């Protein structure tokens, strides 16, 4: 044992000596470790790495389990995964914050955010430059100004075509106009002034002293400007009243000849033009039966002077285009208001395009810079969103694309609380805590934004259904129109929400206790104790709402309506559109008869005219229909309303006469229906009586409806006049088919039709139809039509 131990000991010593003699090498580097090797590397017991896929799997060209999402199997791995998710959430929150900052109006209204522009995409597809997909363009003719299918002009063209075909008259004889002011249109002419751009331009003008507008004294100008602050300023709050008063004072104090003349100012001139145009309606006396009275001469002189001041302002603005200021934008906005009140809509739309470019140059569409005073920030916001309101209103009226794209806008909505009202520079006090004088502007902006979104979605849906076919018309396919009606019902929810959220102090109370913005035509409870500006804002907001709904639902009126029961939603929208039109007529008739709140307010005349066109269209398309008598009564009320304003709005008198003439044409269509029934009444009645005499038992076992006649015998005029309805099948008695009801109409007396569609000649004939005659003509469909109207309008009447 000792020998063995000694031998091993010697060997150990020798080995240690050998190791000490050899040089010491560096320790091997520690290999990189991974939390978990991939499945292939772990199976083959080879090193793996953190790459995805790992290097081994990438070299062999196989799949690697590292590319799949890994679950955290240890605490460090879980911490790393949590940190990665935190970073991702932070990035997403930053993106959301940028979107909210760029489109604050979407967050406040809750409507869908408009799509981003193509410039935001990183990849470009040049196929989009040759995209020929178009939506519903309607029936257009070359060489004419384009008006979209949702515009009043296009609706007038549809009515004119239908009357031409139904009465076999040339379409050139149609007397309807899309704009009521065109019934008394006077082309503007140039009026020379000492403030023209150059002396040479003055020499070219006719030197007629009667056409030269006299310069007003300071007291006369202030007399007109005082009308501004409780009228247009409450609707378009784009001025700071304190700043304007200081600016106006400087124009007189710094004039060359002291205080006798004022320095040239485009803003003051255009404000004087708008106020003179507005005040021209106040010169008319009560007794104007003796021709051209002194008051009428004063009104014409005021209109002429307003036109002169407008033209002078435009010449002054031309010299300021290269270096514009906020005041230039304000001047252009009131120029557009002047043109809109004169019903020069195309001119106003073109002027708006230049105004928006000036606003872009002044960066009004972008969030105000830091360091700008709160007063100026709010003023810039109010100016920009006033431009947005005007752009949307003109674009929807003319049926053209809007000029403002909200994807490029980062200017938030202005405030409307008491603090923002204090910053505005205007003192208009009210006892209501939930509103200020700026609330009307904010609510109008939200409403127009929502309606424009609904109409944009409607056009997009039309484009999808038509697939770019420019020739195909929506009215050729009733099922396609019904699909659009179903789609529109979903989009109208946003407008319903707006109605529910309007501040109560901005709503008009009703005498019958019904809800504001309803269509039941209850009389308004006009409060004499509310401020004048607040009463006017309430009326204009509700009228504006009804007018926008009319423009949205108007395309569903068809000429002539289909005689099948395929389109219940479309038919319901016809009645709903009629209800909103009659609501406008009822409100305007009451307000203009009892008060002077809207006297001289030109836009309301266009609201009334669009309501008349909608009502006329419904009567022409549905000569025999339960709501038709109410529609014809509403036409009589509208004529009386036009007569009320004809003393100071000359076009109203001619427009009322045109309504009477078109109503007579509607009577002719009803007479055609009656004549068609007269020709078929006697032979079919005798045939039915002989049939019952031959088969008394069979007749007694059947219902009271006679057997259907041949389809080809039906009168075309009757088929055109009957309304589109649905069939309600009773659980206790089988519903007769369409042919059976047509034969029943042939058996009924002709006098019942006059009850359903009375003549417009006298007011006494406007009595509501009896239940018996309505049920005889339309059966249970009358109940459906009334129910549809209540269902579709329930979102405006229920709180």
Curated annotation (Swiss-Prot):
PROSITE patterns: ZN2_CY6_FUNGAL_1, ZN2_CY6_FUNGAL_2
Region spans: Disordered: 190-217, 675-718
Entry's Gene Ontology cellular component terms: nucleus
Biological or metabolic pathway of the protein: Mycotoxin biosynthesis; patulin biosynthesis
Induction comment from the UniProt entry of this chain: Expression is correlated with the production of patulin. Expression is positively regulated by the secondary metabolism regulator laeA. Expression is strongly decreased with increased sucrose concentrations. This decrease is lost in the presence of malic acid. Expression is increased with pH changes from 2.5 to 3.5 in the presence of a limiting concentration of sucrose, 50 mM. Natural phenols present in apple fruits such as chlorogenic acid or the flavonoid epicatechin modulate patulin biosynthesis.
CDD domains found in the cross-reference section: fungal_TF_MHR, GAL4
DNA-binding region: 38-64
GO biological process: DNA-templated transcription; positive regulation of patulin biosynthetic process; positive regulation of transcription from RNA polymerase II promoter by galactose
Keywords: DNA-binding, Metal-binding, Nucleus, Transcription, Transcription regulation, Zinc
Biotechnology: Patulin was originally used as an antibiotic and specifically trialed to be used against the common cold, but it is no longer used for that purpose since it has been shown to induce immunological, neurological and gastrointestinal effects. Genotoxic effects of patulin with dose-dependent increase in DNA strand breaks in brain, liver and kidneys have been detected in mice. However, more recently, it has been proposed that patulin might also have anti-tumor properties.
Deletion consequences: Completely abolishes the production of patulin and shows significant slower colony expansion. Leads to only marginal expression of the patulin gene cluster.
Compositionally biased intervals (Polar residues): 199-208, 687-705
Listed Pfam families: Fungal_trans, Zn_clus
GO molecular function: DNA-binding transcription factor activity, RNA polymerase II-specific; RNA polymerase II cis-regulatory region sequence-specific DNA binding; zinc ion binding
Localization terms from the record: Nucleus
The protein's role, per its UniProt record: Transcription factor that regulates the expression of the gene cluster that mediates the biosynthesis of patulin, an acetate-derived tetraketide mycotoxin produced by several fungal species that shows antimicrobial properties against several bacteria.
Protein name according to UniProt: Patulin cluster transcription factor patL
Organism: Penicillium expansum
Annotated gene: patL
